[in-house]
């Protein structure tokens, strides 16, 4: 038997009121949750920011370098220069759409006859960057070799990843090159897939400049870019065997800006353990 004093049945009007209050509370709680915005509710700023992600962009400029260094090697030696100082003019033009870009880059050295023209196709997303590029250089030919002469081209793919805007890992492998072959014991040739990897760390020093330390090496025999040294000469017909460290660098850099124009300046030191060569490199540029 249930006593009436133990059970409370609200009057209809109170029950209806409490029910309406409960539904109102649920409605308020629901609207406070994170839900996808209605497209009609987007502000003009939101639309502009979304459009900026996939829009056309460009950059143009040039560097002036006291020498053209690549993977720890002085490229002027390939062009016949022996002064170890060969001022180089290096223009660049980049056209991009969103995270994809096409870049044209060139080098013309003052004292030697080394000239180069590179074409890049790249993708960059946050810390990841992937490129495929073609290098055209008429070494010793005063850049007169026909552009479609396959003996003057090589095709390379690279992948970079930067952690915390400080630590950068880089890997490059050449897939096509007329001289990138290793002769096997039976006299036949196989493609070497010459490669290069690099670890770089950048440390800002207050607002003064950035300090970058680089260590780079070839993981295995790289016929087309990693030669042996004989006296003061490089023997490109006899590549260095196996793993070799080729690039130990320390660079101080700073970028000055004025409106949309930037003026990067860097001073670096490079030591190549394989060739036992030391280099000082001064570079300045102009970009807009």
Predicted regions and their residues:
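Cleavable N-terminal export/targeting peptides
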Residues: 1-57
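Transmembrane beta-strand segments of Gram-negative outer membrane beta-barrel proteins
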Residues: 51-68, 102, 123, 265-267
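Transmembrane beta-barrel outer-membrane domains
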Residues: 53-55, 80-86, 112-116, 137, ...
